[in-house]
């Protein structure tokens, strides 16, 4: 089992590139059945020395329409059959059937935006020994985008993540498999997400830290350019910043 430290040591870009295969992504940039568009995104990643690519086959934007397992698998298979490049691939899904299919097709990272609530997802992580991205989700949240009330968002997110880490470790996930993500934009209002990003250094402890703010509305509340935000994250100890790839 390779751990996070071993693969992060081979990367200098600090970027986890995002490729959406959905037709209704956050940003309308899906490339399902768009061979040339997909090829250009992968070439762009290669030219910019980006080693990590996050593949999403279903939208997670507010008000998103759910897709069937079959549709998500179809989109994933399109990518698997189209790709000829060598990257470290992450599967962005909260569907255990889709994730298992990705695992069987050489994906190395499981990125579950729902926070590993599903015990099947945890078992896949245990059995596969793959690296996981544990995304924060409020323990009382009933849906992905239910806005929760925080008194001290940085402190509470940190506590929730630590509690979830203990829980999944008790079920067999190894510490070296885990990276954490504060879930910016998910179940948090604009000011809470902005405060988390500004104070992201407070979340950096014993686990690799991954952050995704690319093209999200709350960054308008932060008086920094995209390049300054990226530098802020890297200087704060963030291991990977999720960024939408451009061609």
Regions found by a protein language model. Give the residues of each.
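Active-site-adjacent loop and "lid" segments of alpha/beta metabolic enzymes
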Residues: 2-4, 17, 25-38, 60-78, ...
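Hydrophobic/aromatic residues located in beta-strands of well-ordered beta-sheets
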Residues: 15, 89, 132, 178-180, ...
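Conserved, mostly hydrophobic/aromatic
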Residues: 19, 45, 49, 53, ...
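Phosphate/pyrophosphate-binding loops at sites that engage ATP/ADP/AMP, CoA/4′-phosphopantetheine
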Residues: 46, 50, 87, 162-177
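Acidic (Asp/Glu)-rich catalytic clusters
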Residues: 46-47, 103-104, 122-132, 172
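Short helix-capping segments at alpha-helix termini
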Residues: 84-86, 105-106, 170-173, 205-206
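Glycine/small-residue-rich loop that forms an oxyanion/phosphate-binding "nest" at active or ligand-binding sites
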Residues: 87-94, 100-103, 111-114
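The catalytic core of metal-dependent phosphodiesterases that act on cyclic dinucleotides
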Residues: 182-184
